[in-house]
């Protein structure tokens, strides 16, 4: 900024875009995908979007309108942190299947209120063993219940191999107290929904 370059950064409860003495401010409460700034990776996405739109010389009215009107619902962004209410519980659907994504999702979930946290997860068989294990290593620090399911397509893995790796990642888990293996994605989701109570949170990894 001191050199007169454009910068985008977060300050307090707003995202700031500045160049020299020219400054624009957008409150996080005006950017729905950030859920008031509690979802850090969505704050980063919003900052990147602001920077890209500014570089294209879009007007700030257009940028603000775009940020205010974009929601990460199933119609706008399917499988990207879609949040639903279900009988007083919170459901989140996301297509995160690598350790970095799982870490970001876990951090986001920890910022949301919940009496009990549950996650439904499988893993792609064409990932490295350590990447599959690491996903549940991360989840085991933040979720009370972990429901493991075997996907219909194992991508070259033997029957039960992916489930075994996911279970290995939960050895020594600091928070998880309930682990269940289920065959079939939809059966696993139905099982999770049946266990949910008002005030719970369930992350479903599609």
Predicted regions and their residues:
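Phosphate/Mg2+-binding loops and adjacent switch elements
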Residues: 1-2
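Acidic-glycine-rich active-site phosphate/pyrophosphate-binding loop
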Residues: 5-31
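Conserved phosphate/anionic-ligand binding catalytic regions in large, soluble enzymes, centered on
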Residues: 41-45
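ATP-dependent carboxylate-amine ligase
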Residues: 23-39, 51-206
């Amino acid at each position: 900024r001191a050199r007169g370059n454009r910068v985008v950064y977060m300050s307090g409860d707003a995202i700031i875009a500045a160049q020299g003495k020219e400054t624009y401010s957008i409150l996080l409460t005006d950017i729905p995908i950030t859920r008031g700034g509690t979802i850090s990776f969505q704050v980063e996405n919003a900052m990147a979007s602001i920077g890209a739109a500014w570089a294209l010389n879009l007007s700030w009215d257009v940028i603000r309108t775009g940020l205010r009107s974009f929601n990460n619902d199933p119609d706008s962004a399917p499988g990207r942190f879609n949040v639903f209410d279900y009988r007083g519980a919170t459901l989140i659907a996301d297509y995160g299947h690598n350790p970095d994504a799982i870490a970001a999702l876990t951090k986001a979930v920890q910022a949301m209120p919940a009496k009990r946290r549950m996650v439904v997860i499988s893993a792609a068989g064409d990932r490295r063993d350590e990447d599959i294990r690491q996903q549940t290593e991360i989840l085991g620090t933040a979720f009370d219940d972990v429901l493991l399911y075997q996907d219909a397509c194992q991508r070259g893995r033997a029957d039960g191999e992916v489930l075994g790796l996911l279970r290995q990642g939960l050895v020594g888990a600091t928070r998880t107290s309930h682990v269940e293996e289920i065959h079939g994605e939809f059966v696993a989701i139905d099982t999770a929904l049946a266990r949910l109570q008002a005030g719970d949170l369930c992350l479903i990894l599609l």
